Amino acid sequence: MTRLRSAASTITNRSTPALALTASHAGSHPAVIVPIQPLLLTLERRPSCPHRVSYPEIEAYRGISSSLRSHNAIVRASDIMAQIDPRDVGTPDEWVPRHPELIRLTGRHPFNSEPPLKYASTFITPMALHYVRNHGPVPRLEWDTHTFSIDGLVKKPRTFGMNELVTTFEQETVTFPVLLVCAGNRRKEQNMIKKTIGFSWGAAGCSTAEWTGVPLHVLLTACGVDREKAQWVWFEGIEDLPHDKYGTCIRASTELDPECDVLVAWKANGELLGPDHGFPVRLIVPGHIGGRMVKWLERIHVSDHESSNHHHIMDNRVLPSHVTAETATAEGWWSKSPYAIMELNVNAVVILPNHDDLLALGEDTTFNDIETYTIKGYAYSGGGRRVIRVEVTLDDGASWQLARIIYHERPSKYGKMWCWVHYELAAPMSSLLCAREVCVRAWDSSMNLMPAFPTWNVMGMMNNPWYRVKIHHEQDTNSLRFEHPTQAGNQKGGWMTKERIMTNDVDSIKMLQVEPLDTSSAATPKPGLTADELSELPLIFADEVAKHNSKKSCWFICRDLVYDATPFLDEHPGGATSILLCGGTDCTDEFESIHSTKAWQMLKKYCIGRCSSTEDDTGTSDTSSDHEETDVALKGRTKVPIVLISREVVSHDARIFKFALPAKDLRLGLPIGNHVFLYAKINGKTAVRAYTPISSENDEDRGFVSFLIKVYFAGDNPVHPEGGLFSQYLDGLHLGQQIQIKGPLGHFTYYGDGNFSLETTNFHAYKFGFVAGGTGITPVYQVMRAILEDAKDQTKVALIYCVRSQRDLLLRKELETLQKLRPGQCRIFYTLSDMELLDRNDPIVRGWAYGKSRLNFAMVKNIIGSDAEDVCMCGPEGMIEYACKPALLKLNYDLKTQTTVF
């Protein structure tokens, strides 16, 4: 495990350094894109906000407690990096900037995400790290042209433009903080008991921001609302979804009540709303679930009856535990109004210790009562109810300790509190050593109490049992390891994937087996096909599936079976786009992370065959999307012809091959850190090899792609006397001859400013270490160039380049040019193994200022050191396995979480 020192928790009154808290990121790289310190701030009103609290019924009651006013408060969303995520390219949302640390819960599209749980430790959430719940594409709206209407039971129906709204109600505009929570927060715990019909929210589906807008009751009053007849107020957004626009409703008694503080908002944290958060205008209903707060607001309708909108009826309900998705529809459960969720329930979560944190113990493990470890977390309730108590137990509820509650806001004039609180408890080390788990529960002012165990419901909503963090005594490291119940989305980890848990469901009082999260494509297919049915299915090659990627014919692969989704496109609850993005590809991971057992059963009717890879695709992994970009050459699974236009001899056995792309204005379209496959017919058979180009995506490289390739000549190596099949073929190509290229592929992608991803998980590095051998320099050069040619990128790099002799040093001139650009940021060290064979007094040896041997521990220690967040390696297997990895282990690198092999 990788262990990072944490200053966020304390162990007090210990005279010897026997204890140290370490944060472990098992199975992932340390990811600190936003430094935690700037986030550990509390809220103060932004003095520059033009719309102050002035409405007389609310004035002076939206303030934050005076003890917090000395802090420089909100972290602006613009201070937190957001960027266009490559995963959004080819989707309707490819124009929307998003923070790379947001955890995607529903694949590429639509976008639903939550931040890592550690960011819930701050009162105000930067909007770039605010959770997002979208049902479809983000509408692309303009401030100057967007309008929304108010109609129904009002005397003066009106349509408001944004400028009119802001100026007309400037005196009534208010700003105050509100917690937003998705009703599915903590749903993954329910999915571990039994699959619900909802995707797997973790424990960070909640965020607090400072919202600016006009109270809804002011708008309704201005329109002459009929208070006697009005029973419900409907809200609709502008987006078009498969069944209906997104709409819902809330009782008029809530909307017209000044105590309830319902807002029509256009700002968050002092800035105009972002695209994912409803720009230009949305609804804020404090104390209620996020599903009632319509974004991209287009219509407000006052009515004497409840809305029949599809999303109001079919979403955000807690049905009895015995009700399944099928019986809910057959028996009419969805339309029963009492099961609709409005206000939030009481809930609490442990933030510190985080999942897989380690609490290292010294040799002396006898502790007195004043030696403590601080447990921290958040708690909230709905309806404006105050959280009055947070309790922690270390003995499974036999006794409880009161945590100190940190209130960031003060109550409104009416006694309402709309935000979360944070709590902390200094737990005695002597108790932690004997404990099996840390459990937390909260109470609110109505004496609502979190239950000990979950009650399953088909939508997995409002899950609020005690939050349980398991404690494991790790004998090999003499430390305590903390394990949270789950990790958000399709992330691995959590004790609920391994154990049984209890339920107090009166219809099913029994131990429920946790469903395994097996996403292996080799696992038994789920759709209920028998062995006989499987054997009768025709065999369909992956190349054939790849052709069916349009609305006219959309096939996909899931768990080695082929499905024709064309008839289902218009019926899909998430819209046709999310299926079309997977058209022609294997979408096993996305399907399994999102869909319920019901969806698996529905698959059966669309199954048309068994999948088999073609010869060309066997064993390859295409991580790209198959969207058609007009200015790039690479087309995902499609092979693209390229023509050799030059060959440059750069050493006795290395060549630069330059190929023309299909059009001179095309970029290759290769993300930094990715590679491509080259295909050629050799001796009547298709051969394929992976290479990384040395050309860039810059304008000067449009229209062509260049590769630096070592030619393995026949007879050079007695172990492989025939030499390299593919490299010799390339060396023998005549100008004008054609091969094929396919991609992009690869598990490592660099986005800039230290941000990178491995597979689908985002990380951040302040320093990279690189070790390259021979032509393994090409992917390293690609990443180093991206860093060092970007004046804004401050990421440090340290390279050890291992070759046999000076003539084998490829790209040396280019590397040293990069170093001259950023000398304080880049360190390069060469080492020549052939010098071990020469006399020390040889002039060649004496004149060489770098390494004179094979790679060794001293080189890695002195050049790369122990402070790189990730060490990337590319070269001969022997160099990596017997030199790189042992040296990195000795420097306490975790090979699983801190190294990447290209």
Swiss-Prot record:
Its EC number is 1.7.1.3. NADP(+) binds at residues 872-879. Signal peptide: none annotated. FAD binds at residues 689-692, 708-713, 725-727, 778. Heme binds at residues 572, 595. Residues 637-751 form the FAD-binding FR-type domain. GO terms for molecular function: FAD binding; heme binding; molybdenum ion binding; molybdopterin cofactor binding; nitrate reductase (NADPH) activity; sulfite oxidase activity. Mo-molybdopterin binds at residue 182. Gene3D superfamilies: 2.60.40.650, Cytochrome b5-like heme/steroid binding domain, Nucleotide-binding domain of ferredoxin-NADP reductase (FNR) module, Oxidoreductase, molybdopterin-binding domain, Translation factors. Its cofactor is FAD; heme; Mo-molybdopterin. SMART domains: Cyt-b5. It catalyses: nitrite + NADP(+) + H2O = nitrate + NADPH + H(+). Binds 1 FAD. GO terms for biological process: nitrate assimilation; nitric oxide biosynthetic process; sulfur compound metabolic process. Residues 537-612 form the Cytochrome b5 heme-binding domain. Keywords: Disulfide bond, FAD, Flavoprotein, Heme, Iron, Metal-binding, Molybdenum, NADP, Nitrate assimilation, Oxidoreductase. Homodimer. Nitrate reductase is a key enzyme involved in the first step of nitrate assimilation in plants, fungi and bacteria. Belongs to the nitrate reductase family. This is Nitrate reductase [NADPH]. It comes from Phytophthora infestans.
